[in-house]
Structure formats: C-alpha cells, structure tokens
Design a protein with these regions (language model features):
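Conserved alpha-helical substructure of the radical SAM core
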Residues: 2-125
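C-terminal accessory region of radical SAM enzymes
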Residues: 216-244, 271-320
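Short, small/polar residue-rich loop motifs at catalytic or cofactor-binding pockets
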Residues: 249-254
C-alpha cells in the first residue's frame, strides 16, 4: 500500500509524493547511469556513458535482497531506464515476484514492441518527465529541442497502452506559467493520475545551473495559480513551492531507499545527492548502509534510524516557532544542499516570520 506524503495541512517539503505503510519500504533503483539527453537539472549528472546493473545481478541478487528488506514497491530510474538493454527482462522478473514497478523515463527511446511487452506484464506503470510544454523550454532544458515532440508522442502511446501513471516536471526560467496549464490539461486528457512539479534544486548538475535556470518565486506562484483550475481533472502535486502559512512535512529516510548502479544503497537518494555537492558539510557515507551487490541490506536498514542519529529542527528558530509542535521540519537534504548541517531550518520552505513568531500578550493598562 502507498501512503501519501502530500497533505493539505502541511507544506510539501519532501521530494517524494508517496511512501509506504509502516514495516514496508519503497526502493528506487538506478539500473543505468547512462542517458541519451543532457538535462540541466540532472541529480546524478548522467551522460551517454556509465555503468549498468547487469541483468543477472538485478534478477538474482538485487531484487531478492530488496524483497528481504521489506520492499513492496519499486521504481526503476537512471540515467534513462530505456537505455538499459535488459529493461524488459528486469520488469518481467518483478512481475514474477508480484512486485509493482514504476519506470521514470524521458520517453525518447521506447519502441512500440517495448510498450506492448510492458503492458502485457500487468505490473508496470510509467512516469514521464516534461520540463515545460514547448521545444524551446522542455527541449532546450534537456539538451535536445527535438526531444519534445518525441516525448509527447511516446507519452500518448504509453497512455493508449494503459501504462501512463504520472507526469514529472521541473519548472525553470525557460518555461512560462501557461505551459503548465497546457501540460496539466494534456495529462488529464491522457488519464494520468497526477502531475508532480518541483523546482530546480542544487543537486548534481543543478549545482551549476540553479543560479541561472531556477524559476523565481514569482514564477512558481504564477504556475500554482495557472494550474489550480485543473485540480478537478488531475491531481496537482506542487513540491517545495512557496509556502505562506503551513508547517512543513517531515523526512521518511530509511523507508524510501535508493540503490545506485554500482550497488551502493542509500537511506534516501536526496540525502546522498545533497551530500555530494561542493557546499555540503556532510559526507555521503553518512547516508549509505552498504552495497547490495556485496551483501544483504535488510539488517543494516533496520539498524539505521535517521531520527535517532540526527535531530531535525535543532536550532533556536525552530524552537521559537509558533508551528513547531506540528512541523516536520522539512527536508534534511535541502538543508544540506543549502550548505547547512542537519538540524538547521529548511529556510526555503519555512513560512514568513509573521506566521512563525508567536504573539506576545500585551499587558492591559491596569496590570
């Protein structure tokens, strides 16, 4: 079962839309480092070269060890998963294990034969990335203007086959708010469950591109307003959009795990992405529990209790905040990416001071 992390009462500070029930885990597996595009925001700085997880390793080692670590939901990522020569065989192995799987793709390398085969498996759904809805925005942001037409056409084919699940988008300075109205309408017309939008972050290639390509706050607010009328047709998931009033969501590290193509296994992908940035005061090894190709990871994950190791919100600002008791303190990875140690405020998401500072009673004149 999936558990929603995006709720009306809290700002959506975590990069994930859903988690899993207590006692279960969700795993994202980077089956390849390789990608045919060169996206300005890529968390793992993918290029056309890199490591693949071998089919034998994936089927005989990775998947069984993930199952023994209580993984009940799986996402295949990259790089570009369709660049992996054995994607279909990997998905067939998950079907034999009765393991639901999502594929996150740029939808530029998928053949009709692959779509037919994936649809026949019955356990696969696909999330497609759209970073704008024009060649001059999506295509340019992804390093190939021609990619937009291919992605749009392939997404239609995914939908026709019953495979399309969600649309993933990173608003940026190349996009215009009305594009997201068009994108959400497109998603709704195709029967997508949701459109997830999150800003360009300082992870991977985004460290260098953030300053010149990140969408400003005014644009993010305009996108939220432009897409709001579509909320009755498709679920809108604005991640880390400007927050005016709400306490922050919390961190599910240890439940939402990540396997890198070399087998390194993380308690959260974003903590490792952030720790690998030049500004990080934390080392990536703090968030790695071992290598799944070398041995079992279930016990190491069970022993790793993020909130016992680190105290989020351990700072005067949070302690004095009026919403402290109901606040999850936001995303520790975002704190690290901002050059701070875990425990500092997630200032990018904190509501304004007028909300955070408690009112001080004014004594009456006769007191």
């Amino acid at each position: 079962m999936s558990k929603r992390l995006v709720v009306e009462t809290h700002a959506s500070s975590c990069y994930f839309r859903t988690s899993v029930d207590d006692g279960e885990r969700k795993a994202l597996v980077q089956i390849t480092e390789r990608c045919n595009l060169h996206c300005a925001h890529c968390f793992v700085s993918s290029t056309e070269t890199g490591t693949d997880i071998a089919l034998h390793d994936m089927v005989e080692t990775v998947l069984p060890r993930l199952r023994r670590a209580q993984v009940t939901r799986l996402t295949l990522t990259g790089g570009e998963p369709f660049a992996h020569p054995h994607l279909l065989e990997i998905c067939a192995a998950t079907a034999r294990m009765d393991l639901p799987v999502k594929i996150c793709t740029n939808a530029t390398l998928t053949s009709d034969e692959q779509i037919t085969a994936l649809a026949e498996l019955g356990n696969v759904r696909v999330n497609v990335s759209f970073d704008g809805f024009r060649p001059a925005s999506h295509g340019r942001f992804r390093g190939n203007r021609d990619s937009f037409a291919v992605t749009r056409e392939t997404t239609q084919r995914f939908a026709d086959a019953g495979l399309l699940h969600g649309i993933l988008s990173t608003p940026n300075v190349l996009t215009r708010p009305h594009e997201f109205t068009e994108l959400c309408a497109f998603a709704a017309d195709l029967g997508a469950a949701y459109v997830l939008m999150n800003p360009l972050s300082s992870f991977g290639r985004g460290v260098k591109s953030h300053g010149r390509l990140a969408a400003p706050e005014q644009t993010m607010r305009a996108i939220a307003a432009a897409t709001a009328p579509l909320a009755d047709r498709v679920e809108l998931v604005p991640i880390r959009f400007p927050n005016d009033t709400r306490p922050l969501s919390g961190c599910d590290a240890g439940t939402l795990i990540y396997v890198f193509a070399n087998g390194d296994t993380a308690v959260c992908p974003y903590l490792v992405f952030a720790a690998r940035t030049p500004q990080s005061p934390h080392a990536d090894r703090e968030f790695l529990v071992g290598n799944i190709l070398d041995g079992e990871i279930a016990d190491a994950l069970d022993r790793y209790r993020f909130h016992d190791r680190y105290q989020v919100g351990a700072n005067p600002t949070c302690r004095a905040c009026a919403v402290n008791a109901s606040c999850g303190k936001g995303c520790p990875a975002a704190v690290i990416a901002a050059g701070q140690r875990i425990g500092a405020p997630d200032t990018e998401q904190c509501p304004p001071e007028a909300i955070r500072l408690p009112l001080i009673p004014i004594p009456s004149a006769g007191a």
